[in-house]
């Protein structure tokens, strides 16, 4: 769909007066180079020798972006926008949790951690970018574009690692055990992750089990640099919030209110303790 659909869109756009296309790609076209801690994927990069084994979605987006780029020779005028890992609206946490059968991998990762109360240690960079920042970025740099043939990274310029994200989630009041990835893998294979006294299962645990069986390790990796894009947007009054307790707490609260995330155990809740102390 990504490839054929893009071909159709390019064909249609070439028949318009302006021949202009704001193409929404993804930062994950970096493919397996994201596993390399030496990788810094910049807006000026496209083909960096990446592979796509077991990464069919990323391959299709890479090919689709290539179609757009090559269509410049046919007269297509374009800008490419590469969003990161999109979460809810920054101030309210609003996100269509539970409104469809597919909630999203990144939310399911958090749900798995909060319910099983276990996560593995990892230095992989984990992007958390609010949907309103992404949408405003597309509007400002894609629709109100001052330049053409540019690529913009709509990821959070505040770069953090997976373990930092989990530690921040724990600060909102959830007891989370952080263990080495090897131990987490054993628990996955031996079905020792528990929820309400039963074997814990989720889309995330299924994905991890699949990755681990194929020798894919998620211990470290490169990151997507969005400093240039963030600077341009800041000049237009568009700022991305940092990945901190305030932002993650907003997402957690919204998820709890929607019945998607489990509630913080009251006796272990830092928030509840703070409320009682201030009463």
Model-derived features with residue positions:
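Glycine/proline-rich active-site loop of Rossmann-fold NAD(P)-dependent oxidoreductases
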Residues: 88-105, 141-152
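A conserved pocket-lining segment of Rossmann-fold NAD(P)-dependent short-chain dehydrogenase/reductase
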Residues: 48-52, 98-133, 137-141
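Conserved beta-loop-beta element that borders a ligand/cofactor-binding pocket
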Residues: 62-97
């Amino acid at each position: 769909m990504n490839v054929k659909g893009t071909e159709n869109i390019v064909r249609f756009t070439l028949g318009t007066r302006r021949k202009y296309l704001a193409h929404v790609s993804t930062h994950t076209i970096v493919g397996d180079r994201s596993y390399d801690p030496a990788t810094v994927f910049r807006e000026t990069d496209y083909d960096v020798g990446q592979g796509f084994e077991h990464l069919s979605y990323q391959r299709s987006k890479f090919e689709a972006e290539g179609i757009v780029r090559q269509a410049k020779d046919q007269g297509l005028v374009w800008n490419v926008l590469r969003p990161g890992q999109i979460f809810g609206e920054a101030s309210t946490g609003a996100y269509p949790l539970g409104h469809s059968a597919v909630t999203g991998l990144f939310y399911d990762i958090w749900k798995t951690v909060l319910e099983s109360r276990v996560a593995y240690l990892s230095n992989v960079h984990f992007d958390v970018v609010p949907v309103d920042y992404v949408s405003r970025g597309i509007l400002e740099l894609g629709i109100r574009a001052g330049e053409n043939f540019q690529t913009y990274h709509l990821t959070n310029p505040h770069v953090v690692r997976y373990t930092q994200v989990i530690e921040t989630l724990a600060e909102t009041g959830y007891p989370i055990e952080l263990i080495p990835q090897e131990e987490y893998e054993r628990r996955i294979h031996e079905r020792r992750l528990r929820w309400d006294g039963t074997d814990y299962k989720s889309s995330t645990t299924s994905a991890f089990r699949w990755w681990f069986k194929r020798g894919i390790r998620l211990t470290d990796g490169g990151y997507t640099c969005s400093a240039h894009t963030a600077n341009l947007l800041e000049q237009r009054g568009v700022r991305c919030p940092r990945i901190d307790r305030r932002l993650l707490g907003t997402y957690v609260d919204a998820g709890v209110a929607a019945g998607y995330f489990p509630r913080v155990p009251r006796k272990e809740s830092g928030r509840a303790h703070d409320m009682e102390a201030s009463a």
